[in-house]
């Protein structure tokens, strides 16, 4: 039971049909097993009569239970859904469009409708191209590990577009990349690879002027991207005057 309960939801049912329906599937399995037991064993009729009540509750849950929003604290969401890795919310107001993943407070990515600076850490990270010699280099290559919906990439494209800058992104969650194009005006000029950031560095030889590390799982840094080996790997993919910037 523990093995099935661990691996089937994680690798099969949640990616295929989502969390709500996964709960209903397993509830149905448990209800079926209980019904078989009550009917086949010598249980008093009084207890067996309670079985239709459980079946009725299950049917009502199937009809009404999977349509409710998880984000009961948030009204007027532009988008709400699940991916293999995250529970995703996109919300919009007069000033911005924002993406949140798995958390009540905070945002994962943001797009300012007026095209201004965000007032967040992305603005400070704009110093990295200056440190790598963006105006002196014949060409500038940037890699963003943890692309999200492209907040940092959009800013760099706006402020350094005339400096022959090529921006590449790596994002493990393909659904977030889809949302970036649908809601966050992500540029088609920016190549985004669906892959783990560390695995991507292991697979390529190219070197960059700037490597931005902004990979998070919820509010924690992935363990494989916080080790000495990882930072050595990043260093080996930087040009002579290359700069790494980390959120």
Regions found by a protein language model. Give the residues of each.
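Membrane-embedded alpha-helical segments of integral membrane proteins
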Residues: 1-40
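Short, functionally important structural connectors and interaction interfaces within domains
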Residues: 9, 70, 77-80, 193, ...
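Basic, ligand-binding patches in group-transfer machinery
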Residues: 37-104
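Electropositive phosphate-/nucleotide-binding environments in soluble metabolic enzymes
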Residues: 84, 119-122
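A short, flexible beta-alpha/helix-coil linker loop
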Residues: 104-108, 216-219
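Short acidic, glycine/proline-rich loop/turn micro-motifs
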Residues: 109-113
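The AdoMet/dcAdoMet-binding core of the Class I SAM-like
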Residues: 116, 123-247
């Amino acid at each position: 039971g523990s093995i099935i309960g661990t691996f089937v939801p994680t690798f099969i049912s949640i990616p295929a049909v989502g969390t709500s329906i996964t709960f209903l599937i397993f509830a149905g399995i448990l209800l079926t097993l209980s019904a078989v037991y009550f009917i086949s064993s010598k249980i008093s009729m009084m207890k067996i009569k309670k079985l239709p009540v459980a079946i009725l509750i299950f049917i009502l849950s199937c009809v009404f239970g999977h349509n409710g929003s998880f984000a009961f604290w948030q009204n007027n969401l532009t988008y709400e859904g699940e991916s293999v890795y995250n529970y995703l919310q996109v919300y919009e107001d007069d000033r911005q469009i924002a993406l949140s993943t798995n958390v009540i407070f905070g945002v994962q990515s943001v797009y300012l409708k007026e095209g201004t600076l965000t007032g967040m850490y992305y603005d400070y990270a704009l110093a990295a191209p200056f440190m790598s010699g963006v105006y002196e280099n014949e060409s500038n290559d940037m890699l963003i590990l943890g692309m999200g919906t492209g907040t940092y990439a959009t800013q760099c494209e706006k402020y350094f577009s005339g400096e022959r800058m090529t921006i590449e992104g790596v994002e493990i969650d393909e659904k977030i990349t889809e949302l970036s194009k649908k809601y966050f005006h992500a540029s088609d000029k920016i190549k985004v690879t669906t892959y783990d950031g560390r695995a991507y560095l292991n697979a390529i030889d190219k070197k960059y002027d700037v490597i931005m590390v902004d990979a998070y799982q919820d509010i924690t840094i992935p363990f494989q991207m916080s080790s000495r080996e990882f930072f050595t790997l990043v260093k080996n993919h930087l040009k002579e005057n290359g700069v790494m910037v980390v959120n």
